[in-house]
Each structure stands twice: as C-alpha cells, then as structure tokens.
C-alpha cells in the first residue's frame, strides 16, 4: 500500500546495542569517527547509480534519490532563505549558515578535525549524518564476507534497529539534551516540530524492504516501529523535563516541552474542556504528552494493566506540574522508569494482524473520552492510524475494496489535520470514527 495522506505532501535484531544508546548519546555515536563526505559514497558503482540495480542487495541509486527527492539534501540551503535569516536576526546569532544552533540539524555539523578531504558542509544532512562517520567502515563495508554486524562494530550507526533510529531522529526532529531546540527558536519563527518514527521512515526512502534486506537485517514491522518511536519520544520528553540545564530556563521550565496549543489559541475562543488523562483545570499550561498518550495505545495488545498504570502515572505527572519542581521531577522519573522497563517488551512484540484492532479500539476509546483536545495529539493519532491501516493491507487482512475504503477514510482523517490553525476537534473525531467503522 502506498503510504499516503498529508505527510507525503510534506525488528529488533539485538536489544543490547540499541538500549545502550540511551546512556551513550546518538550524537556521540554519529560523531565518533571521521566523516569522509557525501562524495565518498556517490560513485556510480556504489550508491551513485542513476537507476536501481536489478540484481543487487541494495538499490545503488541511493545518492540520486537523496539528492533529488530528500529534503535532508537541501537542509543547509534552507539556511540561506529570507525566513531563516529573519529567525537568526531575532535570535541574535548572526549568519544562520554558520551558527552552530542551526548547523546542528541543517547540516552534518561534525567538528573541523573530524572532516575528510571530500567533506562539504553545504551537502546538508548527508549519509554520515545518519549512518555515522565512515572512516573505519567505508572501504570494507561492501567486501565479500563482511556482514552488517561487522559494519556496526566498525562504527556504522544501526539505523535498522528502531530504538536506535528513533533516538537519532529525535535529536533533530524534536530535540534532545545535546541538540536542544528551544521555545526561543520557535518564538523567533521556526516551525513547530513533530515526529513519528514509522511515518518519517517512509518519507522519500532510498531503500526498500525485500528478501535481501530481511536476510541481512531481520523482519520489518511498521506498527512496531510506530510503537517503539512513541516510547522513545516519551522517554526523551521526560528526560528533558528532569534535566536542570536543558529543560529549564531561569525560573521557567523549557516551554518547548509543553503543548503549544494549550496557550496558542484565539483569545476569543472558548475551547477548554476536561481531560481525564491530566485532571487539570482551565488556564493551566500542559506538558505535551502526545507521545505518552500514544504509548498507552501501543500497550493495548501487549499489556493492558501496564497501559492503565501509565494513565495513572501520566495524570500524576500533570498534577505534579502544578505543585513544585521537585514533585514534577519525581513524577517524571517514575513515569520514565515505567516506559523504560516496557520498551524492550514493546520492541520485541510481534504486532501481527490480531493486535491492530486492539490498537484502533484503544485510540477510539480515548477519542470518546475527550483525550484528543489539542492538535498535537490529533496529529499523532492520524500518523498512528496510517501505520495500522498500512499493516492491515500488508498482512492481507483486507481485500482490495476494503483497502480502497480504508485509504479514503484515512485521507479524510488527514484532511482534518492539514491546517493546525483551523483544526476542528469535531471534524477530527467524526473522521476517526468513520475510519474505525471501516476497519476489519
């Protein structure tokens, strides 16, 4: 099934290495070896072919796909736009194309001493930004007898492992302690950020999941990627909330960690309503708990009791934010410990056809309770629904007519989140209910 909707307009092989990245930053892993530059990968017999090779374990036109279709290739060029320059002026950081806070995510911002002769900053977010410095594996990684495991030992980043991939993607698509994307940046005009691992994995892919990929790297499961991504994103939020340096600015917590739409609403609006998952009254700034909320749905087919505990702990965290920093830290650490303990089980779980109905039912139940009161949660629901619908079709659970109907309902759901400024809770809930009714 083609992965559709708004965002197209815009597996676990070894738990050990992926989980270890929680302590050893993904950024450190990427920057631990010299970066030789995109040009070192673009030879026509390597990754620079104009067309995909038929009888190859990889497509070999990865460079061409990246250069022509992938926004990562134009990330550095974006810094020369009038909008980027305006943001930089407001922040007082000078030329955005030279400012570290911008280069961290709009380029491969490896230190000067770790750059090879063919490295160019203007290449944007290139191969080694995600696959890691290639100094120790470039020459050997395609040799006969060299395995993917060998490449990982030599410094290649394990992007095939969903936990590791999520930790890396989040460094720029949401921000982490070592690449903090702050509310000041947003206030200066930077677009709001959101992320969902499975959806973003399939935006302009330069790879395909086939027999060769599966043989080398293991079975792929999109719903599991979605599930893992929600857990890792939730962990990241809670780590930042309890980070005295990255998560706080003076007497204030870092506001980028909070729900944008809890404050950014029309002054004439009267849209507040209660949420069981927070227990907060009107006029209270709320943490952006969209990923935590989604992780409860992840658990629906895995451990319902754990999902219930997570609801209680999430509510306790929201309540703690109205009391003190100490209470907030304690509640956040407790919730983080729960998610951290559940993540390996989620990553190892086989999200087969029988689990999809449980996930959709859990999502729909929260809609009926009024949990999706703001755009951020609705956006995550739409991306979750896409992962589940794709899985329905890939698993052969629906026939062609049912697949067409589901795609139509999914497109209608995405249409309701196309514009966050005019988002309608009622239209969103109606579209979600229609999608749920059409599901097997």
Regions found by a protein language model. Name each.
Residues 1-4:
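Positively charged n-region of N-terminal signal peptides that target proteins for export
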Residues 8-18:
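Bacterial N-terminal signal peptides
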Residues 23-29, 50-89, 117-125, 133-375, ...:
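Primarily the internal scaffold of c-type cytochrome electron-transfer domains
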Residues 24-44, 48:
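Short N-terminal segments immediately surrounding and downstream of signal-peptide cleavage
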Residues 34-43, 95, 99, 124, ...:
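Residues immediately within or flanking Cys/His clusters that coordinate Zn2+
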Residues 39-47, 103, 128, 170, ...:
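Cys/His/Pro-rich metal-binding microdomains
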Residues 89-128:
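Post-signal peptide N-terminal segment of secreted/secretory-pathway proteins
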Residues 365-372, 376-440:
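A cross-kingdom marker for long, charged
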